[in-house]
Amino acid sequence: FGRNKDVTCEECHETYQVGASDELDDDGFLVRRIEESVCPNCRNPNKILKLPVFKGDRILVNKFTYQVGNPQRWDVIVFRYPEDMQKNYIKRLVGLPGETIRIGRGDVYARQGDQGEFEILRKQNPEKQKLLQLLVYDDRHAPVDLLAKGFPERWTPMARENAPPQNATEPVPSTDPVPPAKPIDGWVRDEKSWKHDPATRSFTIEAGVEATKWVRYQHLVPSQSDWKDLAAANELPYQARPQLITDFCGYNTYTGGRSFNMDDDRFWVGDLTLNCTVEINSITPASATGSPNPELILELTEGVRHYVCRINAATGLATLLRNDELAADASVADITMATAPTPIRGTGKYTLSFANVDDRLCLWVNSTWMSSGLIPFGSGAEFTPPANRNPQASDLTPAGFAVQGLGARVSDLVLQRDIYYRAESVANDAGDFSSHEPELVDSSRIRESLTDPLEYGARYSKNANEAMFNALGPDEFFVMGDNSPRSQDSRLWPNSRRHAVNRHAVPRNALLGKAFFIYWPHGIPFLNSGRGFPVINHTPARDRNGPLVETYPDYAAPFYPQWWRWKRIR
C-alpha cells in the first residue's frame, strides 16, 4: 500500500484500506482531508476523517536478480520512473521485450512483434492469481442491521422456475423479508431445500433430497442513498434489484482529497472466484436417490458460458464442464473439460475455492499456508472464450453451489473477482495527456445498464475501445499497477521530457530490482483509544490567509508492528 488509512466498516465490520495520497500536494503538504470512504463489502459510507494515516509499506528489493537473469512476467519490480529518473516506482511487469500489448474487457493480451495471434496473459502460477483476487462480497461480514430492515440477502436458495416439484417436506420459512419481484434468468426462490441460519451465516440441507438443490448469489448492492433511506425511514422505498459485478475498488472510493468525488465503477467483471467451507454430514447411497453419484457442485457463469465443477463426494473425483453455447437445444449435455482426483472422501469438513480467471478454471481443496491444495487438471482446464463476450441475464446470478444426495452445511462464503485492467492509453507521441483515450467513448449511461446485462452489453460494444501499444524494443518492458483505475503506469505515462519512441516502455537500464518481501508494514498505534499520541503533525499548505486545512498527526506512538503482514511479495 501507499499512503493509506485502515478502516473497519461500522456496519458489516469488514476491514479494508483506503488510499490517502490525495490529501497531499506534489510537494507533500497537506491540502485536503479524506472525509468518507465506502466499504467494498456492504457499501456503507464510513466516517474516516479522524482515523490515523499510515505511510506505505517498507519492502526489501533484490537488486541482484536482474543482473544475473531476466525479469519474469508478473514479477513485482522496482524501477526508475522513465519520465523522471529521480523517482522510484513499483509496478507489476506485464509485457516482455519484443511484445505488442493489447488490453480489452479487463484482460491483457500479447503477441510477438506486429504479427501473429494475440494470446491472453494469464498468471502461469495459479497461486499468484489467487493472491491477486479482490473482494466482491464476504458473507461472514454481512450487514446484519441492513438485512434486518428489509434489504435482501445476496445468497439465496433458488430453483428453476419450471422445475418439477420435489418430495421435500414442509417449506422452510424465509429469513429474507424481501422476495424477488420476478425470476432472475429463470431462477426463483426455493423454500423447500436449504435452510439458512443468519446467525451463523450458513446453509444446511438434509440428505435424501432427490434433485440438485442450489444456493445462488445475486449482486444486490445497497447504494449510499439506500443507507440514508434506511437511516431516515427504517425501510427501503423500492425493491432492490440485482446487477452486474463491477470493478469497484474500495481503496479508491472516498470523498475529500484532491479528487473531489468517488471513482465510478462501471465495468463488468466476469472473472470470479467462489470460496466456501463445506461440511458433508451424510451421503445417501446412489441406489436411494436414483442418481449415479452423490455430488457437490460449484458453478460460475460468464456471459453465454456456464462453468461447472462436479465433485463425487464418495470418490473425490472432480470433473470440470462447460455448456455448449452454440447448441440449439439447451438440454444438450455439457462438454467435459478435465477430471482430477481431490482429497474429498465422504463425510468431513473441506474448504474449497473454484475460480474462472483468465480463460482457465482452477480448484483448490483444503488450501493452507503449508499446502497449496491446487487440484492438477492440466491444460484441459484452459479454454478459448466464446465469440459473444457480452454479459447475459445469467450474470445476475453468476455464482452458485449445490448438492445432490448429500446432507451438508456450507459456510464462509466469499466471492472475489479478478483485477480489471482498464483499456486506457495515450497516443504514442511526445506530450502529456491531450490525446488520452478512455475505455469508453461515452460512459454517461453505462452504469444505468448494470441491472440489464443485454443493454449493458449493447452500450459497451458500441462505445468501447481496446488499448494497443507499439511493440516493445529488445530491452524494454511494459508495467501496470494492481490498482488499475488509479495506477500511473505504462498505459498513461507522459512523454514531454524524454520524447521516447515508446512512451509506454521501461528500459532495462531503469530496473532497480525485484520486490520480494514486506519487512515493515506500518505499525498500529495503541493507547489513547487506539490512536496513540501525536509525535509529528502534517505540515498544511498555506495561502495568504493561513493554513488551507487543519493539521492532524503524521506519526503517532506507541505502536506495534503488523507481524502477520510480513510476507513474500508474489
Residue ranges and their predicted role:
Residues 1-570:
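Extended hydrophobic leader/signal-anchor segments used for secretion and membrane insertion
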